[in-house]
Each structure stands twice: as C-alpha cells, then as structure tokens.
C-alpha cells in the first residue's frame, strides 16, 4: 500500500510505499478523520500523529466520508457532494464510491501530519515550499500583517515576480484586492441607502394616497346607499298614501 503523507505547515507531501502488512494493520478498520499513531511505521516516525483524510482502492474508486462500510457502494450524487463534479446544471449521477473504513484492498491512503515527532522526515518536514500566491481579500491581508481598519492594505499585497523577457525590464504581478473599502465603494453605499430611503418614502406616500382614496370611495358609496334607502322609503310612503286615498 502507498501512503501519501502531507504536512500543511511546510506545504510538502511525499509518497511512501509500505509492503509490510504488520505495519499497515494500525490503519485497518479506522475511519476517515481518525488520528493514528505512526510509531509502528519506523524509528523516524516516532511521535508522529497522522489523520486519515481519504484514499483509493485498487480499482481507483475514492473513499467517501459518511459511508460506514469498507465495501463499494453506488450512490446518487449531485452538486456539492464529494467524489462527483456535475457537467450540467442540476445534473445527478449514480457513482461507485468506497466506504470510509480502511481495509487491505486500499492501494493509496492519504494521510495528514497532525503532530510532528522527534525526528525530521527528509523531503517532508525538513523543507518548506513557499506559497505561490498571497492572500487576496483585504481582511485576510490585515490579519496576516496585523493591520488596523484605518491602515491602507495596498502596499502590503504580495507581488509575484515574472521572468524578464528579451531586453525588457522584469516586472511583477499583484492580484486585485477584494472587499477593499475605497471612497467609490462608500459613495455607492451612500447612493444605495439614499435610493432605498427614497423608495420607502415613495411607497409610504403611495400607501397614504391609496388609503385617502379608499376612504373617499367608501364615503361616496355609503352616501349613495343612504340616498337610495331614502328614495325607497319615500316611494313606499307615496304608494301607501295613494292606496289609502283610493279606498276613500
């Protein structure tokens, strides 16, 4: 079995091939996310703690977190699920994945060093790979350099040098800072708030006009009903008086 070990502190990863079944037994029947002591792998691993982050079986099917079995299952996966990338919007597909329990049928096991031991491992903990890109968001640049909200973050952007071309000056490239508070951003915010207040005032005025018109219409309809009621009562009195005069 191959062990793909990574160390986030240095940004390095290295592939180790272990053929001794006794050394690998420490990983068997363990779930993804569990932490394992790596002392059994050798003297250089003494004191190291490894977290199981994934793996593939001998046919290349990946392990999936949450599937509590060591066999292969077919699951209906959609956007947002691991082990699947949809090609169309809303597409779902039934894919074969392996459970999150490690057994002897694994070909590669992905491990992350949680705790470093006494000795350095060549190519993994003794060297450091610098990050190619720095932070892009303004709040993360402030956090990296311990800046306050009033400090300007633009001078602190990590620039990436580009190789010089034929007879040209070497240049560097910097990312566009996201969520940077500038006077234009504040002006747009003020405009949004002003438009919102204007819409609220307009809707309040329209509601008042509608309520006024509704009250007027109700008053007019009530007056019409009362007028019709008076006319009916007057016509009934006239008809009664005419009937009584005819009888005399």
Curated annotation (Swiss-Prot):
<dbReference type="GO" id="GO:0003735">
    <property type="term" value="F:structural constituent of ribosome"/>
</dbReference>
<dbReference type="GO" id="GO:0032040">
    <property type="term" value="C:small-subunit processome"/>
</dbReference>
<dbReference type="GO" id="GO:0005737">
    <property type="term" value="C:cytoplasm"/>
</dbReference>
<feature type="region of interest" description="Disordered">
    <location>
        <begin position="213"/>
        <end position="248"/>
    </location>
</feature>
<comment type="function">
    <text>Component of the 40S small ribosomal subunit. Plays an important role in controlling cell growth and proliferation through the selective translation of particular classes of mRNA. Part of the small subunit (SSU) processome, first precursor of the small eukaryotic ribosomal subunit.</text>
</comment>
<dbReference type="GO" id="GO:0005840">
    <property type="term" value="C:ribosome"/>
</dbReference>
<comment type="subunit">
    <text>Component of the small ribosomal subunit. Part of the small subunit (SSU) processome, composed of more than 70 proteins and the RNA chaperone small nucleolar RNA (snoRNA) U3.</text>
</comment>
<dbReference type="InterPro" id="IPR001377">
    <property type="entry name" value="Ribosomal_eS6"/>
</dbReference>
<dbReference type="InterPro" id="IPR018282">
    <property type="entry name" value="Ribosomal_eS6_CS"/>
</dbReference>
<keyword id="KW-0597">Phosphoprotein</keyword>
<dbReference type="InterPro" id="IPR014401">
    <property type="entry name" value="Ribosomal_eS6-like"/>
</dbReference>
<protein>
    <recommendedName>
        <fullName>Small ribosomal subunit protein eS6</fullName>
    </recommendedName>
</protein>
<dbReference type="GO" id="GO:0042274">
    <property type="term" value="P:ribosomal small subunit biogenesis"/>
</dbReference>
<comment type="similarity">
    <text>Belongs to the eukaryotic ribosomal protein eS6 family.</text>
</comment>
<keyword id="KW-0963">Cytoplasm</keyword>
<dbReference type="GO" id="GO:0006412">
    <property type="term" value="P:translation"/>
</dbReference>
<dbReference type="GO" id="GO:0005730">
    <property type="term" value="C:nucleolus"/>
</dbReference>
<keyword id="KW-0539">Nucleus</keyword>
<keyword id="KW-0687">Ribonucleoprotein</keyword>
<keyword id="KW-0689">Ribosomal protein</keyword>
<dbReference type="Pfam" id="PF01092">
    <property type="entry name" value="Ribosomal_S6e"/>
</dbReference>
<feature type="compositionally biased region" description="Basic and acidic residues">
    <location>
        <begin position="223"/>
        <end position="248"/>
    </location>
</feature>
